Design a protein with these regions (language model features):
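Nucleotidyltransferase catalytic core that binds NTPs
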Residues: 1-149
């Protein structure tokens, strides 16, 4: 998917599970959108989401992609590649990769991986716009009740 052909604006790539969309996601995606002009969001596959969260996601990857694609700041939502984030990066060819404050990826790891695939990408780590608001915090507060919905 080469979005550069259709746009002179910078392409920003953000990623995540997005199983329980909350105001922290909205603020983060708005901040990501403000860095460029085209915001592409890569949704973690079900397998990756389960590895990251240590439980199956509430919604499957296609439903999560559909939910995120409905957000006004998102120009394109895709399901990411399994087990290799750089396959997704190579397909999108972003100018900027945005990392949320709570994402496990280190900037240097992303930078080194992009260099290996010959992409010159700016890495930006966003700070939490809504302190102490994350899917994990919501899950801690409501526990198993949220999974019984």
């Amino acid at each position: 998917m080469d979005l550069k052909k259709s746009s002179t604006k910078k392409i920003v790539l953000a990623g995540g599970v997005f199983d329980i969309i909350h105001p922290g996601h909205i603020h983060t995606l708005n901040a990501a959108k403000a860095l460029g002009g085209v915001l592409v969001v890569a949704i973690a596959t079900d397998k990756t989401a389960q590895k990251m969260k240590k439980r199956p996601p509430l919604h499957n990857q296609e439903l999560r992609r559909e939910l995120v694609s409905c957000l006004s700041m998102v120009d394109n939502a895709i399901v990411g590649h399994e087990d290799n984030i750089f396959e997704t990066v190579k397909a999108i060819k972003p100018d900027i990769i945005v990392l949320g404050y709570d994402q496990i990826h280190q900037e240097q790891f992303i930078s080194d991986g992009c260099k290996r695939i010959n992409l010159d990408v700016e890495i930006v780590r966003l700070q939490s716009p809504v302190p102490h608001l994350s899917s994990s915090e919501i899950e801690k507060k409501y526990g198993k009740d949220i999974h019984g919905l």
